[in-house]
Every structure is written in C-alpha cells, then in structure tokens.
C-alpha cells in the first residue's frame, strides 16, 4: 500500500492510497492483490493492528513489555442455567465474583476463577482436581470467566481460554498457533464443565469465535502520547474524546502478575487518536497513542465506541 504525501510546514497529509504489493510476515512469498484506489480528505484506521498506518510507514510506540496474552472465546449451550446457578450460590458467597439473579423468570449469572492467589476462589478445588487427573492443563485455569447471554436461556459465554504463551498478534505464525492452542483448550474446558458443574450434563460447544481476542498489538504514535500518570491523576484536556473510569486491566501469562487496578474518572484527548505523521489520519481502537499500562484501561469496547464517535464528530466539524 502506497500513500501519497503532501508536504506542509508542520506536517503531512495523505492524498490517496492504493495497493501495490504485500509481504507476508513469514517471507514465504509475495502476492499482488486487486488494486484499489482510495481518495479521501480523512482516513480512520480501525484495523486493530494499525495495518493501514503500518503500510504507509507511520511511526509506532515502542513495545517495551511482552504482549498481553490473547484469548479465544466460545459458547456452550444445552445448559440448565437455573440448576447451575443454584449450585453456584451454595458454593460461592463472594458476590464480587459470583452473581445469580432471576429476572422475569430467567436466570442470569456470572462467575470467575483465575490461578492468581489474591482471592479465595470458590471454584479452585475443582480446577485443582481436574489438573491432577489430567483432564485439563495447568495453564487452562489461568483465567476462567462465564456469564449468561440475553435471549439465549440455555447458553453461557466463556471469556476464555487465555493463551498462555507470549505470542505476537502481528505475526501469522503466532496467531495460527494461538488459534490451535485455543481450540484445544476449549475442548478440555468443555469436558471439565460437563464433569464438575451441575447443569452441564447435556451441554455442548455451540460456537467458537471466528477471531482471536487481542488485547494489545501495534500502537500508533500520535500527536499526544497518553500515559498512565495522565490516567491516574485524572488529567483534564481541552478536547476529550471520551470520559471513563474503567480499571487498568493488564493480563499477563504468569501467575500473580496481572493488573486490575480501580481508577477514578479520566479523560482521553482527541490528540491521542491523531497520527503524528499525517494531519488527516486517525486511529481508533486498541492501537491508540497511549503507553502500555494506560492502553490496558482504554482497549475495551465502550471506550472504542466512544473513540469512533469522537473522531466522526471531529471530522464532521472540520468539513462543515
């Protein structure tokens, strides 16, 4: 992909882009896709990995830490949710971990477990036993979270497994490995649930996500690099793209090294969505201009929605 630049005294603008040729990340070969010419006054990179920005040679923030582990989510159906919910209430009294509510005759629930030792996890004995008997791997229990899905009364969504290796989400060979390992772990977790959880007797895997859940990959260098100090201090900005209080949520592949830190209210400036290299290029999603820890609070769906809205409003104002 080639970007045509227009020089300015302070910065540059993209005039148009077109596909020329693509390198595969494993250097096996090259191929030429169908050429597409795109001309626009503004460009928004919402690719997640900042693929558009990378292909026109934008600057990126340095990755000083390991990538957060990727996840592969799935659904199980055919579950007696009411039976499982009653059992959970008997086993777990921590309502910060397990909640079970009956709303209009339908049971809604959520529960979790991790291999971290910061809590007395009610589900820990079941995972310990399953590891000892070889039903699941030790790494399969690094992160386990389930919750009901509105309109699907016999289904639970699993926010796991979390792939335990340090893999690069920008490399095809690594994402392929993550998908393989994730699907194998899903099979093991499904057997575990059917054996140890009441209500799962007739349960089955009904869906596996088409894509990996990637928490962090490339981060564009923007006109402002948002920091964890900005976030923790609640620094105010003239042009906030969003306001949030979602915690700093940074996953790690090792035990007792993940971060889930509550925060006060904080703002993200629109300048952290603006490319340093091009005046008319924006990025939304996990690839924003923020340091590693701050990005861990801003990568979630609600914040990404707000980024898109903020950029759209900004561009609309520039065009009017």
Task: List each model region and its residues.
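Conserved beta-strand-loop-beta-strand element in the redox core of flavoprotein oxidoreductases
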Residues: 3-37
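Flavin (FAD/FMN)-binding glycine-rich loop and adjacent Rossmann-like elements that form
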Residues: 18-21, 31-42, 47-320
């Amino acid at each position: 992909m080639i970007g045509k630049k227009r020089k300015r005294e302070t910065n540059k603008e993209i005039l148009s882009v077109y596909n020329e040729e693509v390198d595969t990340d494993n250097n096996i070969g090259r191929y030429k896709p169908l050429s597409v010419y795109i001309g626009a006054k503004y460009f928004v990179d919402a690719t997640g990995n900042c693929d558009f920005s990378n292909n026109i040679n934008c600057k990126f923030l340095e990755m000083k830490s390991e990538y957060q582990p990727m996840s592969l989510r799935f659904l199980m159906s055919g579950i007696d949710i009411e039976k499982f919910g009653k059992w959970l209430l008997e086993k777990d009294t921590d309502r910060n971990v397990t909640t079970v509510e009956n709303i209009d005759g339908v049971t809604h629930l959520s529960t979790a477990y991790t291999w971290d030792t910061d809590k007395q996890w009610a589900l820990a004995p079941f995972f310990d036993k399953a590891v000892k008997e070889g039903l699941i791997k030790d790494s399969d229990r690094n992160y386990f979270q389930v919750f009901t899905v509105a309109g699907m009364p016999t289904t639970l969504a699993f926010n796991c497994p979390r792939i335990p290796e340090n893999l690069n989400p920008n490399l095809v060979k690594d994402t392929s490995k993550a998908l393989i390992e994730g699907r194998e772990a899903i099979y093991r977790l499904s057997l575990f649930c059917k054996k140890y959880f009441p209500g799962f007797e007739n349960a089955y895997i009904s869906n596996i996500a088409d894509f990996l859940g990637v928490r962090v990959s490339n981060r564009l260098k923007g006109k402002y690099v948002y920091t964890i100090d900005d976030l923790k201090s609640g620094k105010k900005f003239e042009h906030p793209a969003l306001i949030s209080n979602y915690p700093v949520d940074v996953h790690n592949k090792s035990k007792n090294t993940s971060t889930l830190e509550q925060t006060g209210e904080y703002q993200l400036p629109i300048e952290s969505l603006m490319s340093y290299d091009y005046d008319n290029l924006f990025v939304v999603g996990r690839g924003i201009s923020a340091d590693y820890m701050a990005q861990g609070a801003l990568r979630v769906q609600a914040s990404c929605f707000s980024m898109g809205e903020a950029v759209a409003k900004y561009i609309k104002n520039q065009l009017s």
